[in-house]
């Protein structure tokens, strides 16, 4: 597959995920105890054996660089690379103006790789996709551009590009983030929306980006400018994500946009559901990341409190002593002392929680210390005085906070 180049857009600021993105770019936000959001996009390429990948970064990218250096460094393998590319500012002293501009400013890297096809994917969604199957569809249709898509409730579709297709899968309509999205014919409750994943013929991509860059009135965005210009020509096709088969998986079509605190929290709760729609345990589709050299988690009773853990994920290096933890995910090196109760919470790691605490429906970022006796998540009005609380009542403790000291 030497003719395929992956371009992962990883420059998202993630303002709706604050305070988790106050000190890191959105793709570097931890997820699922052991991972970062970027890992899922990278694994989709690696598991498809596409190993020429550029990761385009922009805002607050240092933690992303460190993670990729430790977990995704394949430099030295002939003709294979996973390279982060910082904003080059080749077109002047400015950030990327849009998704298309981000690729345009890095056309020199595309030319250097000499691909036949360019796969442009986002990096802040939770899903599994065998990109090779989408590429095969693209080739079979002799498309110039293929867009992956899925069904979305009509009430949520306004946040996405809404697509219309004919019986052959050819795109015949597209509107980016419409106020009144069109439903799927025969399915009035749902719309067909773009996942923001594209496969281009290399020559088509370069031509369209050059033309778009010359337009002063363009927003230089794939959804707003490139796709609306291309689809009327009849060479843009739509790949149905639900037809993508992952070996070893019984569920198909799971895709979560974790761009808000509520969605991020809910995606973690999905991992803990009885019949989890997204599995971290499929040996036929391994999820690579950087695993620090840590001992197994230690879980034991204290002198006056028995440990009680149910429906949880506990990451390596954690030390749980006499605590009661339910329906929660604990990242690397989480230390919880006796008589503390934690439920429906996500702890991102390197966190110390003292004795006799009560924590419910919270997201606790890295390097947080919580003093003994602290109560979080039981009194919304009090929580709002001291912490960030989402509209849905999820308490978020920012990175490095010292609570109760």
From Swiss-Prot:
GO molecular function per UniProt: ATP binding; glucose-1-phosphate adenylyltransferase activity
Pathway: Glycan biosynthesis; glycogen biosynthesis
UniProt-listed Pfam families: Hexapep_GlmU, NTP_transferase
Enzyme class, UniProt record, top EC level: transferase
Documented EC number(s): 2.7.7.27
Keywords, in A-Z order: ATP-binding, Carbohydrate metabolism, Glycogen biosynthesis, Glycogen metabolism, Nucleotide-binding, Nucleotidyltransferase, Transferase
Quaternary structure (record): Homotetramer.
Name of the protein described by the UniProt record: Glucose-1-phosphate adenylyltransferase
Source organism (scientific name): Photobacterium profundum (strain SS9)
């Amino acid at each position: 597959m030497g003719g395929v180049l992956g371009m992962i857009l990883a420059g998202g600021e993630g303002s709706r995920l604050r305070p988790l993105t106050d000190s890191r770019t959105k793709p570097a936000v931890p997820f699922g105890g052991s991972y970062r959001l970027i890992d899922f996009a990278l694994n989709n390429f690696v598991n498809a054996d596409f190993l020429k990948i550029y990761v385009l970064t922009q805002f607050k990218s240092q933690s992303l660089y460190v993670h990729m250096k430790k977990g995704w460094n394949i430099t030295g393998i002939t003709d294979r690379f996973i390279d982060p590319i910082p904003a080059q500012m080749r077109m002047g002293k400015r950030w990327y103006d849009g998704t298309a501009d981000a690729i345009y400013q890095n056309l020199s890297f595309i030319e250097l790789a000499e691909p036949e096809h360019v796969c442009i994917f986002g990096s802040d969604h939770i899903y599994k996709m065998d990109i090779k199957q989408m590429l095969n569809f693209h080739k079979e249709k002799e498309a110039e551009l293929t867009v992956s898509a899925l069904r979305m409730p009509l009430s949520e579709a306004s946040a996405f590009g809404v697509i219309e297709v004919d019986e052959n899968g050819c795109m015949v309509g597209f509107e980016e983030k419409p106020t009144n999205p069109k439903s799927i014919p025969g399915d009035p409750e749902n719309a067909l929306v773009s996942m923001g994943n594209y496969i281009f013929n290399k020559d088509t991509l370069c031509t369209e980006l050059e033309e778009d860059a010359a337009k002063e009135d363009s927003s230089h965005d794939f959804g707003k400018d490139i796709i609306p210009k291309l689809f009327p020509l009849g060479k843009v096709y739509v790949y149905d994500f639900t037809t993508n088969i992952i070996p070893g998986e019984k569920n198909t079509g799971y895709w979560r946009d974790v761009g808000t605190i509520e969605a991020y929290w809910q995606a973690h709760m999905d991992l803990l559901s009885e019949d989890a729609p997204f599995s971290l345990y499929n040996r036929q589709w391994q999820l690579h990341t950087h695993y620090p050299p840590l001992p197994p988690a230690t879980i034991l009773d204290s002198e006056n409190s028995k440990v009680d853990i149910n429906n949880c994920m506990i990451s390596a290096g954690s030390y749980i002593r006499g605590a009661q933890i339910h329906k929660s995910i604990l990242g690397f090196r989480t230390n919880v002392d006796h008589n503390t109760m934690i439920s429906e919470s996500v702890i991102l790691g390197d966190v110390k929680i003292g004795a006799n605490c009560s924590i419910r429906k919270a997201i606790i970022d890295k390097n947080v210390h919580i003093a003994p006796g602290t109560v979080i998540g039981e009194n919304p009005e009090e929580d709002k005085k001291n912490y960030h609380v989402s509209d849905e009542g999820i308490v978020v403790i920012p990175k490095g906070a010292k609570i109760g000291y």
